[in-house]
Amino acid sequence: MAQQGSGYQARYKRILLKLSGEALMGSEEFGIDPKVLDRMALEVGQLVGIGVQVGLVIGGGNLFRGEALSKAGMDRVTGDHMGMLATVMNALAMRDALERANISAIVMSAISMVGVTDHYDRRKAMRHLNSKDVVIFAAGTGNPFFTTDSAACLRAIEIDADVVLKATKVDGVYTADPFKDPHAEKFDHLTYDEVLDRKLGVMDLTAICLCRDHKMPLRVFNMNKPGALLNIVHGGAEGTLIEEVQQ
């Protein structure tokens, strides 16, 4: 586990970290790369070590995508329920990685899964966070048609997080896909309305509107950059910050 930091004051006391399921694949084309899990667990452990309370939401796209199968004829609700189960699988894998690194963690699912996870309870989640446990929120919102990005923003608001940190493969929000357009320009700051007006695709409409309506700051950053997460928590300007008014 990470050692206690000295000489540093964390800017955020409580964060909600959103990881995509694809981030867990590493260099694989499907599933979970244990090396990626272990690296992420150590980075989260560094935050716990300096007293930051961490909530986690992990997508399920590395295992299943309900929307894609719905286009092929599967009932959308059934597909979304299967996607929720994929997020539970990822959450269990992350909990295991954290516990192997001697970091206390709990999985709370929006769908009751007695004997596998705890059922989501806001007050219980807050108690665990205050006890320095990492709380992994699984199964999205528990409802079909809602993305895990929306679930992350919802949980962040419910637990009174200071910020939503969305980990991606690129170091922020760009005018276009930087992998496809070499002339794409990066934004350092944006407002929620700018994200919506420009249709930048940072998150879905529901997620962005939730953050805007509840004044929840959102930072998009590159999780593959070593030390980026810790730098953000210390107040570093990694990636793109989205908030109500630019500072």
Curated annotation (Swiss-Prot):
Main localization category: cytoplasm
Regulation (activators, inhibitors): Inhibited by UTP.
Domain of life: Bacteria
UniProt entry keywords in alphabetical sequence: ATP-binding, Cytoplasm, Kinase, Nucleotide-binding, Pyrimidine biosynthesis, Transferase
Disulfide links within the chain: none
Enzyme class: transferase
Single GO cellular component term: cytosol
One function term, GO molecular function aspect: UMP kinase activity
Residues holding ATP: K18, L19, S20, G21, G61, R65, T168, Y174, D177
Cellular location(s): Cytoplasm
Binding site for UMP: G60, D80, T141, G142, N143, P144, F145, F146, T147, T148
Any one biological process term the GO annotation gives: 'de novo' CTP biosynthetic process
Function description: Catalyzes the reversible phosphorylation of UMP to UDP.
Self-association and partners: Homohexamer.
Name under which the protein is recorded: Uridylate kinase
Protein encoded by which gene: pyrH
